[in-house]
């Protein structure tokens, strides 16, 4: 109750009536005057002034000038009397008894001087709040009224107990604020809602029930005389806030019978409600248990809502259901008598509805600040802020805030029509009385009922009465039918009754009675519909139970088709179908009952069935949203009058969906009111009423108990655009429920606010960019990585993540009806499953790596990767395909296009597989961690420690990666789910998704790319090598990542102890280089300055690329050789050529390997350079590779050319100027760092005496370990080479290594398997163009070396730019078949050097000895090394892995090697360069003993004995191959194949590394046997690796390139290391292999690594003294002048090997594909 302008209590709103012919007297208290509001002379209600219940009078009778006439008599008077007669007002409706109605207030006489002449609004218009200015007068204090009396509800403590209440159910609303019917089931619990949050409950529809209403007498109220002490100031004004009810949902009126619009108590103590601030009141029907959310602390007057704005919070006056509904304030219920002809009361509630967006909103918004700006800001004194914090705010800001909250709402009558549930027509009351009489005629009542319902207007109460009468008639007929003895009469009477009932039901469903249904609240609508259905069913079974023979009774009316069928069981031969096509043309619905179900429910040989089909019932039986999709109710809430917070204004455009009944209702029953369960389900075919914008069909039945639709027992068999087929296991009323999507579709982004939308775009974009960078890194820098299973796994993970991010970005932009919505959901489902599967396989791969030999190997495991691909994508696609087959609509039913509908299929095909993969990944990660910790404590090899460290890092990164990805998509899922349910925490999940998704992209880039040192260097080099990048970026020192460590000393260890640190000298030049460049380089060498030697020391200047002349034609090694413009490097310097730049530097204690990148080839070229002699090693175990060149061998100091060696120069001088010749091939030189003994495997930087700098991580180098050396692994290719004519026979034995592995069968099997894998890999990986170019470089270098030796020993080498070299290069380029099929290291073949080239047939191994016209060797073989990746560290093995004594004994093994040395001493051209450790000079008796052992071997077998032809070295080669030999060869081939298969099947013990087996098992008897057979077929020499004598004679100084083994532990051999280990009794001693085995210049090629020790012993035993002597004599004869020197040098070398190791010369090249080609110089003797 508000105060008037003088501070008194606001006047009370009162109503007075006077019947026609009576006096209307209006009287106020003394001092008060009458203020009329409205008046009417006529009739608006049938109950007022109608003592006899006449229902024929008009209830729409009004005299327009009633208020004018009454004002002239009573306005501003203390009392007045007016005669209610036509003489005074006229006769607006003749024949109708009229009455005079007046609405007025008694106002104070003082108040009339300050008020306008406008009638005051009803009392619910007035509001209370802080002081306001009214009409320019002084400040007025308005005390708040008491809140309306409300029914007490569960969970509500009094009036002020709960701040806010959130409901959980609601019904949908149309765009015009219509509230479709719907029933809520269950009790809703009230929960507390924090201010500012968004409700996530569903307010129920208005629950209006029948209430007994009475009107209390109007008691005039005397206004209070209390007023403010200071009317001009607000300082002492107490203005507590008033809690008003602003609800979006209507509710029942007060249950205590008080009319809220006519009865109110004055508030005589305004201050008592001050504590009611921030309180809320819920309102609703007590019977339903529903609660309605209310709004806190809306102070309208404080908001500036003055008299001009009050109309915005009132529902306008209107006519509805023959009643006039006056202006009503929001939140109040207008109650008045029912229309004429009906008894009871009608009610209608005024609520706030969210307005529809239109162009008028802007104007409305613009007006709000203007209205609020007119309100001045009062001062706040006293304790106002204590009781009401909101009153402390300035009124202007408060007004603006309220206006912002109210701008999208408008007052609306709710529901669409008044609630006339309590209005009942008088004539139905009489029918109800008749049906309850004992002797009443039921058929007569039924006919009268059908007649009245078809002609009279019904109200809501009439619907309840009608269905009740139908129920009562069926119950009475059940008893009365027994009084009819005649069966036919009984059937006729019941049939007549049924006809009347069916007709009445059809009338109730008719369109003309739709308003009568809308008069009922939703719960009553469902109750009436249930009563109608059961009444029809009961009456139908009355007839069915009466019929005793087979019969079919059909009752067809406008809206109902009823069929009663009584069938004999013996006549039922199939299913029973209802209805027939000619009986019910309104619909094509059909129900089919199987024969089995009918027979099970028969009685007395008869089956009684009742079928019914209804029209228009679907418009009555609305779905109940608590049973089905809550989205519909949520959509209703978003568009109804829930005034909650400021964010509600933005929810008007949310996606709207509503659940509707989209088919006719069809019914079948086998028992009255029984839900009979059937053993065989029935089939229903239902036609869709609406085909556009509908989805998600659901088969439902009407539950009589719950008065709601239920899907229990029914399932959807199939559906299309127009029909759905259902299957149910019981009988009742059936229909189809479907989702109706609003035509105005919105994507997922419509629910994002502006900031979140931008952040999601940024987050996804960042993640996508980093994923693409990671993929490009794996592709462009593939040479940096091992082509292993892990690389393939991470590539697949990145691809899946990229697909997920892009599909998510596309999906949130799509609407539900978009054609791409379903496709996006399907592919997103598949991508997520595949991604989680790859994470599982990554964890499994780590586990399998730790539990197998794969720990020390990083090779491409193609079968395992293919299995991963099959399981990942195959399983994912299978699961998605099954999901599509089961229910394709699952991908289109959800609100958003990035999720499946949350049903059983979603959990079984999406959630379950993801959880399985996730749990498996976590399990394997945990197991891997346990195994890794065990191995880290037991691992002995440095290589294994390194791999364990790498695996440990991979496991950590993968685990963090998996957790991060899980958090990202869990946040995304919870955000979408929370946004769908309007949860308050949804934005939190959204921003978490944004943050973690961005972090995921950064994590991928940092931990999978940046943390890798090799990739960092590749990035820097990529920047430096691309001209389109800025020069400042390319010139950065940080972009230079690789080089060669060099120093001012010679190659090797420093000469003195003063050289404690390595130095680096640098100079640079551009290609082509002229003659003057050599001098400039020399000057630069003289002026070198010292720089500390480090891992990544750079020979080239930091800004070398900045000086690159871009216009200069790019030159390579090839062009430099052709033009002769290569710059000679200083003595002892190392040359690095990178693209068009070429730099030189001095070698220090060691060299770090340069690295390569895609698109570049790095060459270290040692052309025409002499090396300084290496000083004696200062510490044992330190052996270094140094730069070989041609001139250091061609022109040795002191004239000792033939015996000069970098490492052995001093040795030659000590023996009187006689030394072993060691050829120096001018190949590209590649250096790896080696280190001496170190503790704990730590790197030691710097140089100096006894120190070797470690090479950078990722290069091919040896890790720091005890006596670690560089280890190279030879690999072999089977190629089609150029075959020559048959040369003179020259046989040489196969040299075995110093030590063989013990287990011959095991190694043979393992190595054969390795060869098979290598062949498969070679077939898959062809030589790239860069490899072919590198092949040309290698061939060209060898041609240069051979050409220098053509003229003899003393001739200087011709310049490299001679025309002959160019012709040879062109000839080589023209031979495409040779280049494409031949190894790049097959340099022993003749290439135009006067050699007759002939194309042979079949396959030959690449490094065979070449043939020429005059005999001799065309050049020693050069070996290549193909490593899978630079990331692979060098392997180290324990000496205990090999058992010397089991393989060789001292008498045989040492003698054999001594025989070789004797042969070398006799003829260096054959064995010169073979540096074999251990033993002494072999005596002739030993040779004879070996020859005798050799002669004892069988003459011919399919094993190694096939090589008996090699024993007779002096015999002439026989070109003829007999047929018996050919047959023998074929038989042996078959046996070999079978032997290979058997070997593969043996389960032999595992070995740590296959590469070690490849290294140690060098000789392969099987290969030798097959090679000789192939030679016989091709007419070639039977000697394995035989070459022409003329070549050896032409190049007597050449010793074939060899490999050697030195353990670095004294003797320089593996045997010596093994002996030291046995002596020291140290089983943990490590042995590093850095030296392979040698052969002569015309010796055989290095065989594949699959020969067993037994086969090698057999081959060694075949050596006879005669063959050895003859071969030695032959070699001595070709070079007789050097024979004695060889013997002497050989003996001296054996003595020196006991003291120190020899330095080796290694030539190598690394191309962009990380193929390393190694060339070793001959061993010093």
UniProtKB/Swiss-Prot annotation:
Pfam families reported in the protein's UniProt record: 7tm_2, GAIN, GPS, SUEL_Lectin
Under PROSITE patterns, the record lists: G_PROTEIN_RECEP_F2_4 (PS50261), GAIN_B (PS50221), SUEL_LECTIN (PS50228)
Per UniProt, which keywords does this protein have?
A: Cell membrane, Disulfide bond, G-protein coupled receptor, Glycoprotein, Lectin, Membrane, Phosphoprotein, Receptor, Transducer, Transmembrane, Transmembrane helix
The residue spans the entry assigns to the Cytoplasmic side of the membrane are as follows: 779-791, 840-865, 932-958, 1008-1725
Extracellular side stretches: 1-757, 813-818, 887-910, 980-986
Record field: compositional bias (Polar residues) = 259-282, 371-390, 1651-1666
- Keyword Membrane among record annotations: yes
Task: Tell me where in this chain the GAIN-B domain is found.
Answer: 551-744
* Localization in the cell: Cell membrane
Glycosylation site list: 135, 236, 278, 326, 388, 645, 693, 720
Residue numbers for the site described as Cleavage? Answer: 731-732
Where are the residues of the annotated region Disordered?
164-284, 361-390, 1056-1088, 1236-1263, 1309-1337, 1472-1555, 1636-1705
GO CC, sorted alphabetically, is:
plasma membrane
Q: Which InterPro entries match?
A: GAIN_B, GAIN_dom_N, GAIN_dom_sf, GPCR_2-like_7TM, GPCR_2_extracell_dom_sf, GPCR_2_secretin-like, GPS, Lectin_gal-bd_dom
The residue ranges flagged as biased composition, category Basic residues, are 1237-1246, 1684-1693
Record-annotated disulphide pairs: 699-726, 714-728
Q: Where is the composition biased (Low complexity)?
A: 167-176, 224-236, 1309-1327, 1478-1496, 1667-1683, 1694-1705
**What kind of modification does the protein receive after translation?**
Proteolytically cleaved into 2 subunits, an extracellular subunit and a seven-transmembrane subunit.
Region (GPS): which ranges?
699-744
> Mind listing the GO biological process terms from this record?
adult locomotory behavior; cell surface receptor signaling pathway; proprioception
Molecular functions per Gene Ontology: carbohydrate binding; G protein-coupled receptor activity; mechanoreceptor activity
Every SUEL-type lectin domain range: 18-107
Residues where Phosphoserine is found: 1153, 1255, 1262, 1328-1329
Q: How does it assemble?
A: Forms a heterodimer, consisting of a large extracellular region non-covalently linked to a seven-transmembrane moiety.
Family recorded in the similarity comment: Belongs to the G-protein coupled receptor 2 family. LN-TM7 subfamily.
| Name of the protein described by the UniProt record | Latrophilin Cirl
């Amino acid at each position: 109750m508000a105060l008037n302008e003088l501070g008194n209590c606001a006047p009370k709103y009162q109503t007075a009536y006077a019947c026609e012919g009576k006096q209307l007297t209006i009287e106020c208290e003394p001092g008060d005057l009458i203020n009329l509001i409205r008046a009417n002379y006529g009739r608006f209600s049938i109950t007022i002034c109608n003592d006899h219940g006449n229902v024929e009078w008009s209830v729409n009778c009004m005299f327009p000038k009633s208020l004018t006439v009454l004002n002239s008599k009573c306005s501003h008077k203390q009392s007045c009397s007016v005669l209610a007669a036509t003489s005074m007002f006229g006769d607006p409706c003749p024949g109708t008894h009229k009455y005079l109605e007046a609405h007025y207030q008694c106002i104070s006489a003082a108040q009339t001087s300050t008020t306008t002449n406008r009638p005051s609004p009803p009392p619910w218009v007035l509001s209370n709040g802080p002081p306001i200015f009214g009409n320019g007068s002084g400040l007025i204090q308005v005390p708040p009224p008491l809140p309306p009396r409300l029914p007490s509800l569960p969970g509500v403590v009094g009036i002020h107990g709960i701040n806010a209440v959130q409901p959980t159910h609601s019904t949908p609303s149309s765009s015009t604020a219509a509230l479709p019917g719907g029933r809520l089931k269950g009790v809703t619990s009230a929960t507390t809602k924090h201010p500012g949050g968004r409700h996530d409950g569903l307010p129920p529809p208005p629950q209006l029930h029948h209430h007994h209403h009475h009107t209390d007498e109007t008691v005039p109220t005397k206004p209070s005389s209390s007023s403010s002490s200071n009317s001009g100031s607000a300082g002492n004004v107490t203005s507590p806030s008033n809690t008003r009810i602003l609800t979006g949902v209507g509710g029942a009126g007060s249950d205590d019978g008080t009319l809220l619009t006519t009865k109110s108590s004055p508030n005589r103590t305004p201050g008592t409600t001050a504590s009611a601030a921030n309180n809320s009141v819920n309102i609703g029907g007590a019977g339903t248990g529903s609660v309605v959310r209310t709004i806190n602390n809306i102070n309208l007057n404080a908001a500036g809502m003055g008299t001009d704005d009050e109309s915005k919070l009132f529902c306008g006056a209107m006519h509805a259901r023959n009643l006039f509904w006056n202006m009503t304030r929001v939140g109040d219920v207008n109650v008045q008598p029912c229309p004429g002809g009906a008894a009871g009361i009608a009610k209608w509630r005024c609520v706030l509805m969210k307005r529809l967006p239109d162009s008028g909103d802007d104007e409305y918004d613009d007006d709000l600040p203007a209205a609020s700006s007119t309100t001045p800001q009062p001062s706040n004194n006293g304790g106002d802020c204590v009781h009401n914090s909101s009153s402390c705010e300035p009124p202007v800001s408060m007004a603006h805030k309220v206006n912002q909250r109210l701008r999208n709402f408008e007052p609306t009558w709710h529901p669409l029509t008044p609630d006339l549930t309590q209005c009942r027509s008088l004539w139905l009351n009489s029918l109800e009385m008749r049906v309850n009489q004992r002797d009443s005629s039921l058929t007569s009542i039924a006919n009268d009922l059908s007649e009245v319902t078809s002609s009279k207007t019904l109200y809501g109460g009439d619907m309840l009465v009608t269905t009740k009468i139908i129920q009562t008639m069926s119950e009475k007929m059940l008893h009365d039918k027994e009084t009819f003895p005649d069966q036919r009469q009984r059937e006729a009477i019941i049939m007549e009754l049924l006809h009347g009932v069916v007709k009445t039901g059809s009338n109730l469903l008719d369109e003309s009675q739709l308003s009568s249904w809308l008069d009922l609240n939703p719960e009553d609508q469902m109750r009436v519909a249930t009563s109608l259905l059961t009444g029809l069913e009961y009456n139908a079974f009355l007839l069915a139970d009466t019929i005793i023979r087979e019969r079919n009774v059909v009752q067809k009316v406008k809206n109902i088709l009823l069929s009663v069928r009584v069938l004999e069981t013996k006549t039922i031969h199939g299913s029973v179908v209802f209805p027939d096509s000619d009986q019910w043309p309104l619909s094509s619905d059909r129900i089919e009952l199987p024969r089995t179900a009918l027979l099970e429910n028969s009685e007395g040989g008869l089956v009684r069935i009742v079928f019914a089909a209804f029209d228009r019932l679907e418009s009555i039986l609305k779905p109940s949203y608590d049973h089905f999709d809550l989205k519909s109710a949520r959509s209703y809430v978003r568009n109804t009058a829930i005034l909650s917070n400021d964010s509600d204004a933005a929810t008007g455009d949310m996606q709207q969906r509503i659940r509707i009944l989209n088919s006719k209702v069809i019914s079948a029953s086998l028992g009255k009111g029984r839900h009979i369960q059937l053993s065989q389900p029935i089939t229903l075919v239902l036609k869709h009423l609406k085909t556009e914008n509908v989805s998600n069909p659901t088969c439902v039945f009407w539950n009589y108990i719950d008065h709601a639709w239920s899907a229990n027992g029914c399932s959807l068999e199939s559906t299309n655009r127009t029909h759905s087929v259902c299957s149910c296991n019981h009988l009742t009323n059936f229909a189809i429920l479907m989702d109706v999507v609003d035509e105005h579709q919105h994507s997922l982004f419509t629910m994002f606010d502006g900031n979140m939308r931008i952040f999601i775009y940024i987050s996804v974009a960042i993640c996508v960019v980093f994923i693409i960078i990671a993929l490009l890194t794996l592709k462009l820098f593939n040479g940096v990585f091992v082509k292993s299973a892990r690389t393939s796994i991470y590539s697949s993970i990145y691809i899946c993540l990229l697909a997920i991010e892009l599909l998510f970005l596309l999906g949130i932009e799509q609407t539900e009806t978009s054609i791409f919505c379903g496709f996006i959901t399907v592919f997103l489902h598949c991508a997520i499953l595949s991604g989680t599967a790859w994470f599982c396989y990554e964890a499994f791969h780590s586990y399998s790596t730790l539990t197998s030999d794969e720990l020390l190997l990083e090779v491409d495991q193609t079968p395992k990767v293919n299995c991963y691909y099959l399981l990942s994508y195959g399983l994912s696609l299978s699961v998605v395909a099954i999901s599509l087959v089961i229910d394709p609509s699952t991908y289109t039913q959800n609100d958003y296009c990035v999720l499946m509908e949350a049903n059983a299929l979603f959990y079984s095909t999406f959630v379950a597989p993801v959880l399985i993969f996730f749990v498996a990944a976590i399990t394997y990660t945990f197991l891997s961690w346990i195994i890794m910790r065990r191995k880290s404590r037991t691992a002995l090899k440095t290589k294994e420690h390194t791999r364990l460290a790498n695996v440990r890092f991979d496991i950590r990164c993968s685990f963090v990666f998996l957790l991060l990805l899980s958090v990202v998509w869990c946040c995304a899922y919870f955000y979408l789910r929370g946004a769908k349910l309007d949860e308050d925490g949804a934005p939190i999940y959204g921003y978490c998704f944004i943050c973690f998704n961005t972090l995921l992209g950064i994590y991928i880039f940092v931990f999978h790319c940046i943390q890798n040192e090799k990739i960092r260097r590749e990035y820097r080099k990529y920047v430096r090598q691309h001209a389109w990048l800025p020069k400042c970026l390319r010139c950065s020192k940080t972009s230079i990542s690789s080089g060669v460590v060099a120093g001012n000393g010679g190659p090797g260890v420093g000469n003195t102890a003063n050289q404690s640190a390595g130095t680096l000298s640098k100079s640079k030049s551009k290609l082509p280089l002229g003659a003057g460049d050599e001098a400039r380089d020399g000057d630069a060498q003289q002026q070198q300055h010292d720089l500390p030697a480090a891992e990544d020391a750079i020979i080239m200047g930091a800004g070398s690329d900045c000086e690159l002349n871009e216009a200069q034609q790019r030159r390579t090694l090839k062009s430099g050789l052709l033009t002769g413009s290569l710059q000679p490097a200083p003595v002892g310097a190392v040359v690095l050529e990178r693209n068009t730049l070429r730099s030189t530097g001095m070698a220090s204690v060691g060299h770090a390997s340069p690295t390569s990148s895609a698109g570049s080839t790095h060459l270290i070229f040692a052309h025409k350079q002499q090396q300084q002699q290496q000083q004696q090693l200062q510490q044992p175990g330190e052996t270094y590779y140094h730069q070989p060149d041609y001139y250091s061998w061609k022109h040795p100091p002191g004239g000792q050319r033939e015996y000069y060696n970098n490492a052995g120069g001093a040795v030659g001088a000590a023996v009187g100027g006689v030394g072993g010749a060691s050829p120096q091939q001018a190949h590209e030189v590649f250096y790896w760092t080696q280190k001496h003994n170190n503790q704990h495997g730590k790197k030691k930087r710097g140089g100096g005496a006894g120190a070797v700098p470690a090479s950078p991580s990722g290069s091919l180098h040896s890790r720091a370990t005890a006596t670690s050396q560089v280890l190279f692994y030879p690999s072999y290719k089977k190629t089609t080479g150029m075959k020559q004519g048959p040369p003179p026979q020259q046989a040489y034995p196969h040299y075995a290594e110093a030590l063989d592995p013990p287990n011959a069968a095991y190694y043979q099997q393992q190595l054969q398997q390795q060869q098979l894998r290598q062949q498969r890999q070679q077939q898959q990986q062809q030589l790239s163009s860069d490899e072919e170019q590198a092949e040309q470089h290698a061939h060209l270098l060898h041609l240069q070396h051979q050409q220098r030796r053509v003229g003899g020993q003393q001739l200087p080498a011709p310049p490299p730019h001679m025309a002959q070299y160019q012709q040879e290069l062109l000839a080589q380029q023209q031979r495409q078949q040779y280049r494409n099929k031949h190894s790049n290291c097959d340099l022993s073949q003749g290439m135009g050097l006067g050699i007759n080239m002939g194309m042979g047939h079949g396959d030959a191994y690449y490094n065979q000895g070449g043939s020429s016209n005059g005999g001799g060797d065309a050049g020693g073989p050069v070996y290549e090394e193909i490593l899978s990746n630079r990331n692979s560290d060098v392997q180290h093995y324990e000496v205990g892995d090999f058992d010397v004594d089991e393989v060789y004994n001292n008498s045989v093994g040492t003698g054999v090697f001594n025989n070789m040395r004797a042969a070398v001493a006799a003829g260096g051209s054959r064995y010169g360069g073979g540096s074999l450790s251990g033993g002494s000079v072999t005596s002739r008796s030993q040779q004879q003993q070996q020859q005798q052992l050799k002669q004892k071997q069988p003459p011919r077998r399919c094993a190694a004995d096939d090589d008996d032809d090699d024993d007779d070295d002096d015999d002439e080669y026989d070109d003829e191959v007999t047929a018996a030999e050919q047959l023998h060869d074929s038989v042996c081939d078959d046996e070999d194949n079978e032997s290979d298969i058997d070997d593969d099947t043996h389960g032999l013990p595992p070995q740590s590394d296959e590469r070690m087996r490849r290294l140690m098992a060098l000789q392969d008897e099987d290969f030798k046997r097959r090679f000789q057979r192939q030679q016989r077929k091709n007419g070639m020499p039977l000697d394995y690796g035989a070459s022409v004598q003329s070549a050896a004679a032409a190049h007597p100084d050449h010793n074939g390139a060899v490999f050697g083994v030195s353990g670095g532990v004294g003797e320089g051999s593996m045997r010596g290391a093994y002996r030291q280990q046995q002596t020291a009794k140290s089983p943990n001693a490590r042995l590093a292999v850095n030296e392979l085995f040698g052969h002569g210049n015309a010796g055989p090629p290095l065989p594949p690594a699959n020969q067993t020790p037994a086969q090698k012993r057999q081959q060694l035993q075949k050596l006879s003294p005669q063959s050895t002597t003859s071969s030695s004599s032959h070699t001595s004869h070709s070079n007789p002048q050097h024979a004695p020197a060889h013997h002497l040098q050989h003996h001296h070398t054996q003595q020196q090997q006991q003291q120190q190791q020899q330095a080796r010369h290694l030539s190598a090249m690394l191309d962009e594909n990380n193929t390393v080609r190694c060339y070793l110089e001959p061993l010093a003797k």
